[in-house]
């Protein structure tokens, strides 16, 4: 796989493709992704983690921002609580293979005078409506937002500037914030970042992934629980909006070279696949039973997540 193909695989959008190709010609290129510290790291987080590993392997200098101050502003806990979660998250990410990169705690630079002045300068230029719209996909209780939540996207823009990165990675829900950065940072003599967006995956029940619904798999989940959750997962005969196939595409094949469907000879015997595309095609033709697919995905996930479970002990 060439460098460009590795960078764009499993993405939904790059803004812009021309700028990305130009960036890949540079000897030094830097990218970042930010994470609000969370009590559970799950498959939703793993989409960007997998992409950061791709970017690292493609020659990017990778920075992970552990956004403790952002989490505090977004009502996720006290500063003390979110700092503890940030350290736990770092250990999870390292256990998932996100090593040989830089981890930065947001509060280590976001309280500096230089950073705060940039935030205030940007806030002068951006209307309240633009700030609120940019937060609609990522904020809590946005029908009645706090002033701190309006500062959140402006801080994210300042992060891109202060970290000195060429590209920003995030879920497609970050798009509006990233577009603000592309529009306004050049006016403050900072380059417009290349923006790389990955999809927001469905929960295992086919609905929006949510901690309150428990429709996700944590990276620290037991083998038994992974099998139970995957067995109950929504897996329609169609390819579209199939959460089990999404796990296969975005989590299994980026990390494993092959996946084997194990079944008795009377049902066709074992069959090994070397790519997601090959497996999706076979499933669409009815050559793989949903129950067999779910079993294979569960066992593959157990293999992939074993190192992080061991690392966290």
From Swiss-Prot:
A GO-annotated cellular component: cytoplasm
Subunit organization: Homodimer.
Residue span of motif 'HIGH' region: 37-45
Catalytic activity line of the entry: tRNA(Tyr) + L-tyrosine + ATP = L-tyrosyl-tRNA(Tyr) + AMP + diphosphate + H(+)
Keywords: Aminoacyl-tRNA synthetase, ATP-binding, Cytoplasm, Ligase, Nucleotide-binding, Protein biosynthesis
Domain of life where this protein originates: Archaea
Keyword Magnesium in annotation: no
Functional summary from the UniProt entry: Catalyzes the attachment of tyrosine to tRNA(Tyr) in a two-step reaction: tyrosine is first activated by ATP to form Tyr-AMP and then transferred to the acceptor end of tRNA(Tyr).
Family membership: Belongs to the class-I aminoacyl-tRNA synthetase family. TyrS type 3 subfamily.
Matches recorded under PANTHER family: TYROSINE--TRNA LIGASE, CYTOPLASMIC (PTHR46264:SF4), TYROSINE-TRNA LIGASE (PTHR46264)
Name listed for the protein in its UniProt record: Tyrosine--tRNA ligase
Annotated source species: Methanospirillum hungatei JF-1 (strain ATCC 27890 / DSM 864 / NBRC 100397 / JF-1)
Single biological process term from Gene Ontology: tyrosyl-tRNA aminoacylation
UniProt cross-references to SUPFAM superfamilies, sorted A to Z: Nucleotidylyl transferase
'KMSKS' region (motif): residue ranges: 208-212
Residues where L-tyrosine binds: 32, 152, 156, 159, 174
Binding site for ATP: 211
Protein localization: Cytoplasm
EC identifiers of the protein: 6.1.1.1
GO MF, any single term: ATP binding
Entry-linked Pfam families: tRNA-synt_1b
Top EC category: ligase
InterPro entries in the cross-refs: aa-tRNA-synth_I_CS, aa-tRNA-synth_Ic, Rossmann-like_a/b/a_fold, Tyr-tRNA-ligase, Tyr-tRNA-ligase_3, Tyr-tRNA-ligase_arc/euk-type, Tyr-tRNA_synthase
UniProt xrefs under PROSITE patterns: AA_TRNA_LIGASE_I (PS00178)
């Amino acid at each position: 796989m060439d460098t460009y193909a590795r960078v764009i695989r499993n993405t939904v959008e790059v803004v812009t493709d021309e700028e990305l190709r130009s960036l890949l010609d540079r000897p030094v290129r830097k990218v970042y992704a930010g994470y609000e510290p969370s009590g559970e790291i799950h498959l939703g987080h793993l989409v960007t983690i997998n992409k950061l590993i791709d970017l690292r392997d493609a020659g990017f200098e990778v920075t992970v921002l552990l956004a403790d101050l952002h989490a505090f502003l977004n009502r996720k806990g006290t500063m003390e609580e979110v700092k503890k979660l940030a350290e736990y998250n770092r250990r999870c990410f390292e256990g998932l293979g996100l090593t040989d990169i830089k981890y930065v705690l947001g509060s280590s630079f976001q309280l500096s005078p230089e950073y705060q002045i940039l935030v205030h300068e940007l806030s002068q230029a951006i209307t309240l409506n633009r700030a609120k719209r940019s937060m609609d996909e990522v904020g809590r209780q946005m029908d009645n937002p706090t002033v701190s939540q309006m500062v959140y996207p402006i801080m994210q823009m300042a992060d891109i500037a202060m970290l000195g990165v060429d590209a920003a990675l995030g879920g497609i829900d970050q798009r509006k914030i990233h577009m603000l950065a592309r529009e306004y940072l050049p006016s403050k003599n900072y380059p417009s970042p290349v923006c790389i967006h990955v999809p927001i995956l469905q929960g295992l029940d086919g609905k929006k992934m949510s901690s309150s619904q428990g429709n996700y798999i944590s990276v620290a989940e037991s083998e038994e629980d992974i099998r139970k959750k995957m067995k109950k997962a929504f897996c329609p005969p169609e390819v579209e909006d199939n959460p089990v196939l999404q796990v296969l595409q975005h989590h299994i094949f980026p990390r494993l070279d092959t996946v084997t469907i194990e079944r008795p000879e009377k049902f066709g015997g074992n069959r090994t696949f070397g790519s997601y595309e090959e497996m999706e095609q076979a499933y669409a033709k009815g050559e793989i039973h949903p129950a067999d697919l779910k079993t294979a995905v569960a066992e593959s996930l157990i293999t992939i997540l074993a190192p992080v479970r061991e690392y966290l002990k």
